[in-house]
Amino acid sequence: MNIFRLLLATLLVSLCFLTAYSHLAEEKPKDDRSLRSNSSVNLLDFPSVSIVALNKKSKKISRKEAEKKRSSKKKASMKNVARPRPPPPTPCVATRNSCKSPAPACCDPCASCQCRFFRSACTCRVLSPRC
C-alpha cells in the first residue's frame, strides 16, 4: 500500500511540474536586426535634456510666483461661492422630506428628488455640497 501511495505522489508531482512548464511563456531568440527594425521607440526621436542648477534668487522667485497663483486661485474660488442662488419656488419641499410625483420641487436648488423601492419612498436629497 505504501508503494502505491508513493507512486501516486510522484505521479501527482510530475503532473504539477508539467502543467507549470506548459504555462511558461516561450521566448524565441531574435537577432539584433529584427530588434532594431521592429522597435517602436527610437532614441533619436526624443530631445536632449539639459540640467540647469537653480540659484537662491530663482528659488525665491518661483516660491513667490507660486504664492501668487495660490492667492489668485483662492480669490477665484471665493468669487464662485459668492454667486447668488435662484429663489426657491413658492410651493416647495424641504430637504429630506417626502417628494412624490404630485409634490412640488425641492426648495434647495442643489437638491433633487430621489426615489427608492420602485418609487414608493421619495425624498429630497442634496447630491453635491459644493453646488
Swiss-Prot record:
The positions making up the signal sequence are 1-22
| All residue ranges annotated as the Agouti domain in the record | 92-131
Q: Which SUPFAM superfamilies match?
A: Agouti-related protein
**GTP-binding is among the record's keywords:** no
Which Cys-Cys disulfides exist here? C92-C107, C99-C113, C106-C124, C110-C131, C115-C122
Keywords assigned by UniProt, alphabetized:
Disulfide bond, Glycoprotein, Knottin, Secreted, Signal
> Where is it found, in Gene Ontology cellular component terms?
extracellular space
> Which GO biological process annotations does it have?
hormone-mediated signaling pathway; melanin biosynthetic process; melanosome organization
Location of this chain's protein in the cell: Secreted
Asked whether the keyword Transmembrane is assigned, the reply is no
- Annotated region Disordered: where? 57-93
Q: Name one GO molecular function term.
A: melanocortin receptor binding
Q: What does this protein do?
A: Involved in the regulation of melanogenesis. The binding of ASP to MC1R precludes alpha-MSH initiated signaling and thus blocks production of cAMP, leading to a down-regulation of eumelanogenesis (brown/black pigment) and thus increasing synthesis of pheomelanin (yellow/red pigment).
Instruction: Present the record's domain note.
Output: The presence of a 'disulfide through disulfide knot' structurally defines this protein as a knottin.
Can you name this protein? Agouti-signaling protein
According to the entry, what is the taxonomic lineage of the organism?
Answer: Eukaryota, Metazoa, Chordata, Craniata, Vertebrata
